[in-house]
């Protein structure tokens, strides 16, 4: 009975951390959208809070990895395996890969090594990864509802 209680508690820590990551990622994307608007002639350069975008992006990425490790650790603790959640786990790997590429490109941009084209690629990769995040959220709700 004690193990079952631990399993259900652990199962809710992962989605809470991931939800915090998603909220900070959406805010980071909103800040990045301001830059995109400026480059298209809408607004001034001062409208884009560069440092704030970088800080929130770092928070998002760190929370995303923490959430991933909690999810993987919880699965390993409960089941003794990692990829028992099937498509949810594989989609998580794709999401982490896409955001890792986006963060790497963002790092190059923050060091002044990028072009407008690189900034656009950075934005497209990160925004498209959020499509997979929406699918992942649906899968997570299914897991919490039917499998725990």
Where are these regions (language model features)?
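Membrane-embedded alpha-helical bundles that constitute the cytochrome b-like, heme-associated redox core
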Residues: 1-148
């Amino acid at each position: 009975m004690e193990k079952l209680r631990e399993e259900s508690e652990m199962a809710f820590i992962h989605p809470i951390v991931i939800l915090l990551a998603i909220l900070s990622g959406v805010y980071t994307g909103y800040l990045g959208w301001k830059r995109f608007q400026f480059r298209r002639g809408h607004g001034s350069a001062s409208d884009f809070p560069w440092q704030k975008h970088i800080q929130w992006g770092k928070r998002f990425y760190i929370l995303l990895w923490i959430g991933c490790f909690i999810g993987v650790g919880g699965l390993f603790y409960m089941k003794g395996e990692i990829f028992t959640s099937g498509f949810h786990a594989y989609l998580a790997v794709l999401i982490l890969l896409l955001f890792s590429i986006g963060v790497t490109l963002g790092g190059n941009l923050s060091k002044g090594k990028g072009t407008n084209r690189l900034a656009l690629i950075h934005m497209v990769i990160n925004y498209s990864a959020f499509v997979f995040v929406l699918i992942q959220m649906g899968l997570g709700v299914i897991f919490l509802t039917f499998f725990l």
